[in-house]
Amino acid sequence: MAQTQLPHDAKAGPTKPEVRAVVRSKLALTDDDHFVEVGSCTGAVTIAAARDAGRVTALERKADRLETTRKNLAANGLADAVELRNAEAPAELPADADALFIGGSRNYDAVLDHAAETGVDRIVMNVSRLEVAGAATQAFRDRDILTEVVQFQVSHGYELAGATSFDSENPVYMLVGSASGDTEADR
């Protein structure tokens, strides 16, 4: 698996590599899929998806972050592999997405409405704030699209006084859903 290079940064920072690995697993992208990311920021998830999906669209409302995505795509040899849109979702969301990643919590209700209306098969939303995780979980339930909630925390070891200690990242709440009518048992 190719390493993702992120030489260009954005204030929000990238989705961590371990979290991206779980996102990729939950999305289970194939070369037949149209993947859409809302809130591309550094492009870390977009880059991973561009290696798996046949078609990729990334939306980012902030022009400077979209430029960061563009630069990081180029640094990974994927400059022409992704359609970039400077828009605030749900505006300009494609109606033919097979898989959707929501990287931020802004307007997620409207994004989930769009996903439910268009029958997106695989939906993943990452949340780092507890209150948003609870509200977003309820939003998935209200639309009858919730299939799974995962909470995890990554810690990296470092040397401390000749032994190993751990530096912990913030926990991530991952909401997984489907608006296609398929259940997990059907997949």
Curated annotation (Swiss-Prot):
It is an enzyme of class 2 (transferase). S-adenosyl-L-methionine binds at residues 15, 39-43, 60, 89. Pathway: Cofactor biosynthesis; adenosylcobalamin biosynthesis; cob(II)yrinate a,c-diamide from sirohydrochlorin (anaerobic route): step 8/10. GO terms for biological process: anaerobic cobalamin biosynthetic process; methylation. It catalyses: Co-precorrin-6B + S-adenosyl-L-methionine = Co-precorrin-7 + S-adenosyl-L-homocysteine + CO2. InterPro entries: CbiT, Cbl_synth_MTase_CbiT, Cobalamin_biosynth_MTase, SAM-dependent_MTases_sf. Keywords: Cobalamin biosynthesis, Methyltransferase, S-adenosyl-L-methionine, Transferase. The keyword Transferase applies. The keyword Methyltransferase applies. SUPFAM superfamilies: S-adenosyl-L-methionine-dependent methyltransferases. One of its GO terms (molecular function) is cobalt-precorrin-6B C5-methyltransferase activity. Belongs to the methyltransferase superfamily. Archaeal-type CbiT family. HAMAP family: CbiT. NCBIfam families: CbiT. This is Probable cobalt-precorrin-6B C(15)-methyltransferase (decarboxylating). It comes from Halobacterium salinarum (strain ATCC 700922 / JCM 11081 / NRC-1). The gene is cbiT.
